[in-house]
Amino acid sequence: MQIVELEMVPLSLRPVLQRLYDMKTTQSALREGVLFSTKRNNYYYDTGTGKVIVLDDDTSYIFRVLFDPTLSAETFLISLTKVDPNAVKNLLQTIDAERLFQRPPLLSMGKEIAAGVTDTEQKVEQIILEVTEQCNFRCKYCVYSEDFSGNRDFGNRRMPTEIAFKAIDWALENSGAKLAITFYGGEPLLNFKLMKAVIERSQAKRGNKEIVYSFTSNMSLMTREIATYLAQVPNLYIMASIDGPRTVHDAYRVYANDAPTFEDSIGGLRILADAYAGSHMPVNINAVLTPPFGFEKLEQVNAYFESLDWLPATCHVNITYPSYGTCPGLDEYYDKITGNPKYALHGMCNPLMIWQQRKAETDGLDAYKARNIYYHSIFDDLVKINNRIIVDEPTLRRGLNGCCVPGKKRLYVTATGEYK
């Protein structure tokens, strides 16, 4: 079959059809966009413009043929004869008017990254200080355990004050109007003295620069003295590591002598909450979902965090799976549940996401009742979709994802003063 045989296509739209035909001939449609579906509709996301169009049944059929690499270009033309002629005409008009399927070809890779390395005006955005390698916990899924080869093991080194000050002074001189300072460990509160010194030095030398501070803590070393000090630090954000109720938390988060940590962690978080009483509490929670991943366990963990009424209702509870290769028994558990349709989503085993989506559908998303393990995951994804780049002129828009220009976005300083 030839394009000229399709009488339902006006002459003015045949160049559009020819472009689709050529695309099908080379099976290059997959780089132009993505087909996806919800319970109510089928959609097409256009890579070049960021636009999303709703597909009726006829256009959905045409697009499925277009995107199927096992079907020929002739089959694509034949598909146009099997639907309402007006649907074909309207589809081609939409593609032409919205400038769909016109993403520019990728002719080079990494030019903007290479250029950034030689730019003498680079301004670092975040400096991460490894204030200590020490940790008083030995969480069974920790990426720094001796059983995981991807990172260093736990050490005993602490960052000296002179290294911290030198790093901070450099960052203050080589950053823009805003600088993020992050304290990292180990457990950062093991070297709270240095954290406090860095905060006070950076505040004294910041000038008009805005500084944002952050750190993640297991909360076990939190005292009223520390909490009172932290509560008066401007632009400070804290992430508390707590996995859920006692039985869930203590199953994997233990001290070096294998003793449980729940009481000390939740007690430290309560002390911090008391210090912020009557004011905004910039503290969120990070939980790790350990085996088993069943819906019953997710309900248990969710109910626990919802019950902590001494925390702000808007407290962000982030929950993730353990890093690959870190959690004992994780591979065996995945082998057991993989293939179970109860936990399958888009061809992948993902019980957490399935539960989160169902919970959002049944209970809704209420910003004033967000202290749970589904609100922020779903809401943040929706925000990303809503704030995506949408343009009329098709463009590549951005460089390679995951590629960092050294010293531009963030800089990690080890306890011994090495840059990473």
Language-model regions, residue ranges each:
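Auxiliary Fe-S-binding modules of radical SAM enzymes
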Residues: 1-49, 55-71, 78, 327-335, ...
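Long, charge-rich, low-complexity alpha-helical segments
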Residues: 6, 53-128
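Accessory C-terminal segments flanking Radical SAM cores
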Residues: 28-31, 36-61, 369-420
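Short, solvent-exposed loop/turn segments at secondary-structure junctions
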Residues: 50, 134, 188, 220-221, ...
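Conserved alpha-helical substructure of the radical SAM core
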Residues: 83-90, 94, 108-228, 233-236
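Short loop/turn segments at strand-loop or loop-helix junctions that form parts
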Residues: 131, 143-145, 240-245, 317-323
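A cross-domain feature marking catalytic cores of carbohydrate-active enzymes
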Residues: 185, 215-219, 240-242, 285-289, ...
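Radical SAM enzyme [4Fe-4S]-AdoMet core and its adjacent flexible, acidic
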Residues: 247, 252-266, 270-402, 412
